[in-house]
């Protein structure tokens, strides 16, 4: 059936999801999303720019439409191809388990553990600030400079230099009746 059912229809009025369903029916097997999009674009005679604009909605429609099923790794099929009981099995346990073994397994590296080669490139985060040692030494030295007896301080001996002339500070503290009237 597939694309033949659209033979008498205006292609501009067809939705991408309808065409994708028909393409999968005609193909009869799983297809990668990119292949589906290319086939839809070719059938509808749409430009690359127009397809790019409609692509997010098309992908959302495929996910939400109950007739499509994602087989993983962006491969899609029609749900009607699978018996209801086997849908979960098919999605969770692909037939090609050998492909999983061929994938590269990367060795995990922990940068915070010492390596077996004994490299000195490992950073000791507990002892990373040389200024910590300087501060500890300065604190020890400064304890001797000060005594608990503050008898050298004379509270009554105020220097005359501490008194400021009555400049702007005096002007700010003085308030005239004329100043109050200007604010109102």
Curated annotation (Swiss-Prot):
Domain HTH HARE-type: 14-81
Source organism, top-level taxon: Bacteria
Gene Ontology molecular function, alphabetical: DNA-directed RNA polymerase activity
A GO biological-process term: regulation of DNA-templated transcription
Assigned keywords, A-Z: DNA-directed RNA polymerase, Nucleotidyltransferase, Transcription, Transferase
Acidic residues bias: start-end ranges: 118-164
One Gene Ontology term, aspect cellular component: DNA-directed RNA polymerase complex
Matching InterPro entries: Asxl_HARE-HTH, RNAP_delta_N_dom_sf, RpoE
Region (Disordered): 88-107, 118-184
Keyword Transcription annotated: yes
One Pfam family linked to the record: HARE-HTH
Family: Belongs to the RpoE family.
Description of how the protein assembles with itself and partners: RNAP is composed of a core of 2 alpha, a beta and a beta' subunits. The core is associated with a delta subunit and one of several sigma factors.
Protein's name in the database: Probable DNA-directed RNA polymerase subunit delta
Organism: Lactobacillus acidophilus (strain ATCC 700396 / NCK56 / N2 / NCFM)
